[in-house]
């Protein structure tokens, strides 16, 4: 996650980690296997760094879910009349930020800039659902990064 945010914010990874105050490597759940035992990062830590640099981070969830309680069987996916995939793609095509989802085994994040995906693992490609899935990346949420105080143009 920090690599993708560093790419989207155009800051060196070392500077981003210094601003967060840790590298995510501390073992905090010793009973779990690698890499689940590691501290890693919460998106709020990265949002705080972005805010300190004058950027707002707004989530655009692919399939938002209504859920009356934190636990329990009740939930309802929000389906948009103009299609959730089109809405999600429009956000990626018209802004820059980070997309989180799952990779082949665990969570994964990539940076994006107006429809172009920059994967910290190396690949650079144009965004589409099929292109992401061809790279074994299954999207969940776009974190749009915009300068604070500027009105977004769609």
Residue ranges and their predicted role:
Residues 116-154:
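Noncatalytic regulatory segments and standalone regulatory/sensor domains
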Residues 1-36, 52-53:
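Active-site nucleophile-adjacent alpha helix/oxyanion-hole segment immediately C-terminal to the catalytic cysteine
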Residues 27-107, 112-122, 128-133:
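Conserved active-site-adjacent core of cysteine acyl-enzyme catalytic domains
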Residues 8, 84, 146-148:
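Extracellular and analogous surface-interaction loops
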